[in-house]
Curated annotation (Swiss-Prot):
Efficient DNA binding requires dimerization with another bHLH protein. Binds DNA as a heterodimer with MAX. This is Max dimerization protein 3. It comes from Xenopus laevis. Disulfide bonds: none annotated. Residues 54-106 form the bHLH domain. The gene is mxd3.
Amino acid sequence: MEQLPSNLQVLLQAAEYVERREREAEHGYASILPCDPATPGRRKRQRTNSNPDNVRSVHNELEKHRRAQLRRCLEQLKQQVPLSMENSRHTTLSLLHRAKQHIKKLEDQELRAKSLKEKLRADQQKLRQRLKRLLPPNTERIRTDSLDSSNLSSERSDSDQEDLEVDVEGIILSGNEGELFVSFSAGLEHSYSTPAHAWL
Protein backbone atom coordinates (compact mmCIF):
# COMPACT_ATOMS: atom_id res chain seq x y z
CA MET A 1 0.00 0.00 0.00
CA GLU A 2 2.90 2.34 0.59
CA GLN A 3 4.22 1.83 -2.95
CA LEU A 4 1.09 3.34 -4.51
CA PRO A 5 1.33 6.74 -2.80
CA SER A 6 4.99 6.95 -3.68
CA ASN A 7 4.20 6.31 -7.32
CA LEU A 8 1.47 8.95 -7.25
CA GLN A 9 3.86 11.39 -5.64
CA VAL A 10 6.46 10.80 -8.33
CA LEU A 11 3.87 11.34 -11.05
CA LEU A 12 2.67 14.56 -9.40
CA GLN A 13 6.22 15.86 -9.14
CA ALA A 14 6.86 15.00 -12.77
CA ALA A 15 3.67 16.78 -13.84
CA GLU A 16 4.60 19.88 -11.84
CA TYR A 17 8.07 19.85 -13.36
CA VAL A 18 6.67 19.62 -16.90
CA GLU A 19 4.17 22.43 -16.26
CA ARG A 20 6.87 24.64 -14.75
CA ARG A 21 9.16 24.08 -17.76
CA GLU A 22 6.33 24.83 -20.18
CA ARG A 23 5.52 28.09 -18.38
CA GLU A 24 9.17 29.12 -18.45
CA ALA A 25 9.40 28.27 -22.15
CA GLU A 26 6.32 30.39 -22.91
CA HIS A 27 7.77 33.38 -21.10
CA GLY A 28 11.22 32.86 -22.60
CA TYR A 29 13.02 32.19 -19.35
CA ALA A 30 14.32 28.76 -20.22
CA SER A 31 14.27 26.12 -22.86
CA ILE A 32 12.57 22.76 -22.64
CA LEU A 33 15.66 21.01 -23.93
CA PRO A 34 18.85 21.09 -21.89
CA CYS A 35 21.30 23.79 -22.88
CA ASP A 36 24.08 21.91 -24.65
CA PRO A 37 26.62 23.95 -26.68
CA ALA A 38 26.91 21.16 -29.23
CA THR A 39 23.18 20.92 -29.96
CA PRO A 40 21.81 22.08 -33.35
CA GLY A 41 19.53 24.56 -31.61
CA ARG A 42 22.53 26.45 -30.24
CA ARG A 43 24.25 26.50 -33.62
CA LYS A 44 21.04 27.77 -35.20
CA ARG A 45 20.86 30.60 -32.66
CA GLN A 46 24.46 31.52 -33.41
CA ARG A 47 23.72 31.68 -37.12
CA THR A 48 20.64 33.82 -36.54
CA ASN A 49 22.64 36.13 -34.31
CA SER A 50 25.34 36.59 -36.97
CA ASN A 51 22.86 37.12 -39.86
CA PRO A 52 22.06 40.76 -38.98
CA ASP A 53 25.74 41.65 -39.23
CA ASN A 54 25.97 40.08 -42.68
CA VAL A 55 22.84 41.85 -43.83
CA ARG A 56 24.17 45.16 -42.52
CA SER A 57 27.50 44.75 -44.30
CA VAL A 58 25.79 43.85 -47.59
CA HIS A 59 23.50 46.85 -47.22
CA ASN A 60 26.48 49.13 -46.58
CA GLU A 61 28.28 47.87 -49.69
CA LEU A 62 25.20 48.38 -51.84
CA GLU A 63 24.71 51.87 -50.46
CA LYS A 64 28.36 52.73 -51.10
CA HIS A 65 28.07 51.49 -54.70
CA ARG A 66 24.86 53.47 -55.22
CA ARG A 67 26.42 56.69 -53.95
CA ALA A 68 29.50 56.24 -56.12
CA GLN A 69 27.32 55.69 -59.18
CA LEU A 70 25.26 58.76 -58.29
CA ARG A 71 28.42 60.88 -58.03
CA ARG A 72 29.58 59.70 -61.47
CA CYS A 73 26.21 60.54 -62.98
CA LEU A 74 26.26 64.00 -61.42
CA GLU A 75 29.76 64.65 -62.76
CA GLN A 76 28.67 63.65 -66.27
CA LEU A 77 25.60 65.87 -65.95
CA LYS A 78 27.77 68.77 -64.79
CA GLN A 79 29.89 68.47 -67.94
CA GLN A 80 26.86 68.52 -70.25
CA VAL A 81 24.81 71.26 -68.60
CA PRO A 82 26.02 74.88 -69.00
CA LEU A 83 26.52 76.32 -65.52
CA SER A 84 26.72 79.95 -64.52
CA MET A 85 30.00 81.42 -63.31
CA GLU A 86 28.39 83.20 -60.37
CA ASN A 87 29.04 80.39 -57.90
CA SER A 88 32.00 78.08 -58.22
CA ARG A 89 30.29 75.49 -56.01
CA HIS A 90 26.96 74.11 -57.19
CA THR A 91 24.64 72.01 -55.10
CA THR A 92 22.92 68.92 -56.40
CA LEU A 93 19.55 70.68 -56.33
CA SER A 94 20.79 73.64 -58.38
CA LEU A 95 22.47 71.27 -60.84
CA LEU A 96 19.26 69.30 -61.35
CA HIS A 97 17.28 72.53 -61.72
CA ARG A 98 19.64 73.82 -64.42
CA ALA A 99 19.57 70.44 -66.15
CA LYS A 100 15.78 70.62 -66.27
CA GLN A 101 15.91 74.12 -67.78
CA HIS A 102 18.52 73.03 -70.32
CA ILE A 103 16.42 70.02 -71.38
CA LYS A 104 13.37 72.28 -71.81
CA LYS A 105 15.43 74.68 -73.95
CA LEU A 106 16.72 71.85 -76.14
CA GLU A 107 13.19 70.52 -76.61
CA ASP A 108 11.97 73.96 -77.72
CA GLN A 109 14.88 74.27 -80.17
CA GLU A 110 14.10 70.84 -81.58
CA LEU A 111 10.44 71.76 -82.12
CA ARG A 112 11.41 75.01 -83.89
CA ALA A 113 13.92 73.16 -86.07
CA LYS A 114 11.31 70.57 -87.05
CA SER A 115 8.76 73.24 -87.97
CA LEU A 116 11.37 75.14 -90.01
CA LYS A 117 12.37 71.94 -91.78
CA GLU A 118 8.77 71.21 -92.72
CA LYS A 119 8.31 74.78 -93.98
CA LEU A 120 11.45 74.59 -96.13
CA ARG A 121 10.37 71.23 -97.51
CA ALA A 122 6.97 72.65 -98.49
CA ASP A 123 8.63 75.69 -100.12
CA GLN A 124 10.96 73.42 -102.07
CA GLN A 125 8.04 71.35 -103.31
CA LYS A 126 6.19 74.49 -104.43
CA LEU A 127 9.26 75.78 -106.30
CA ARG A 128 9.71 72.45 -108.06
CA GLN A 129 6.10 72.46 -109.19
CA ARG A 130 6.39 76.06 -110.39
CA LEU A 131 9.57 75.29 -112.33
CA LYS A 132 7.89 72.29 -113.89
CA ARG A 133 4.98 74.45 -115.06
CA LEU A 134 7.24 77.18 -116.49
CA LEU A 135 9.57 74.94 -118.49
CA PRO A 136 8.54 72.80 -121.48
CA PRO A 137 8.60 69.04 -120.91
CA ASN A 138 11.83 68.32 -122.88
CA THR A 139 13.73 71.50 -122.08
CA GLU A 140 14.87 70.43 -118.68
CA ARG A 141 16.17 67.10 -119.96
CA ILE A 142 18.10 68.70 -122.84
CA ARG A 143 19.48 71.37 -120.56
CA THR A 144 20.57 68.77 -118.03
CA ASP A 145 22.26 66.62 -120.69
CA SER A 146 24.12 69.59 -122.17
CA LEU A 147 25.29 70.73 -118.77
CA ASP A 148 26.50 67.25 -117.91
CA SER A 149 28.42 66.88 -121.20
CA SER A 150 29.99 70.34 -120.97
CA ASN A 151 31.00 69.76 -117.38
CA LEU A 152 32.48 66.39 -118.28
CA SER A 153 34.51 67.81 -121.19
CA SER A 154 35.73 70.75 -119.12
CA GLU A 155 36.70 68.43 -116.30
CA ARG A 156 38.62 66.22 -118.72
CA SER A 157 40.46 69.17 -120.29
CA ASP A 158 41.29 70.57 -116.87
CA SER A 159 42.56 67.20 -115.68
CA ASP A 160 44.66 66.73 -118.84
CA GLN A 161 46.12 70.21 -118.44
CA GLU A 162 46.93 69.51 -114.82
CA ASP A 163 48.63 66.24 -115.81
CA LEU A 164 50.75 68.07 -118.37
CA GLU A 165 51.69 70.73 -115.87
CA VAL A 166 52.58 68.13 -113.29
CA ASP A 167 54.68 66.18 -115.79
CA VAL A 168 56.60 69.29 -116.87
CA GLU A 169 57.02 70.75 -113.43
CA GLY A 170 57.90 67.41 -111.88
CA ILE A 171 61.11 66.99 -113.95
CA ILE A 172 64.29 67.29 -111.90
CA LEU A 173 67.21 68.18 -114.15
CA SER A 174 70.82 67.18 -113.51
CA GLY A 175 73.84 69.17 -114.77
CA ASN A 176 74.08 67.83 -118.36
CA GLU A 177 70.30 67.65 -118.71
CA GLY A 178 70.02 71.28 -117.60
CA GLU A 179 72.48 72.39 -120.29
CA LEU A 180 70.55 70.36 -122.85
CA PHE A 181 67.28 72.03 -121.82
CA VAL A 182 68.86 75.51 -121.98
CA SER A 183 70.39 74.89 -125.41
CA PHE A 184 67.11 73.51 -126.70
CA SER A 185 65.21 76.56 -125.50
CA ALA A 186 67.84 78.88 -127.09
CA GLY A 187 67.02 77.49 -130.56
CA LEU A 188 70.05 75.29 -131.23
CA GLU A 189 69.53 72.42 -133.61
CA HIS A 190 69.54 68.97 -132.10
CA SER A 191 68.65 65.83 -133.94
CA TYR A 192 67.06 62.77 -132.35
CA SER A 193 68.77 60.59 -134.93
CA THR A 194 72.19 61.35 -133.40
CA PRO A 195 71.72 60.91 -129.68
CA ALA A 196 75.48 60.80 -129.10
CA HIS A 197 75.85 64.47 -130.08
CA ALA A 198 72.81 65.46 -128.09
CA TRP A 199 74.26 64.36 -124.78
CA LEU A 200 77.71 65.91 -125.24
